[in-house]
Amino acid sequence: MDAAVKRKLISSDGKTVEVEDSCFKLSKVLTNLVNDFPEPEKELPINDVTEDTLKKIITYLEHYKDPEVKPKDIPKPLPGPDLKLVLDDWDFNYITPLSLQECVDLINGANYLDIPELVTLVSARLASEMLNCEVEEARAKFGIESDMTQEEMDEYDKYPLD
């Protein structure tokens, strides 16, 4: 892939985002699309990713397009909720300002485009949000409703695990 070749990606909301195809090395899907459609004027549809999310993904890919710059390994499990301890400065400044909904959209987009390093980064951010949370706090934070009835929850509470 030639560094000077610009590609037009069409987001799921019909917006065009231009990017150099030299940025695609971390994405198996984008690399395959360029190989399948080598003509630079060919618009590449990205059906499951909105423009806003696609721009965030491209920012990540542009940062890591240089072979000398590699994403830092993130320990699993996280040692604690402070991402500053496990991320380099760029990744920290990239991921921490995002809302939880933006993170969910980003992890879905990164998964769709097969960018495992970005999936790992966003997963670490989401995991850091859940560390030390009680179940109800995590449900509230992520908008998850319980599938248990009140009666089932009351029955469950009769038998604590402690």
Model-found features: residue ranges?
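Short leucine-rich amphipathic alpha-helices used at interfaces
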Residues: 1-2, 139
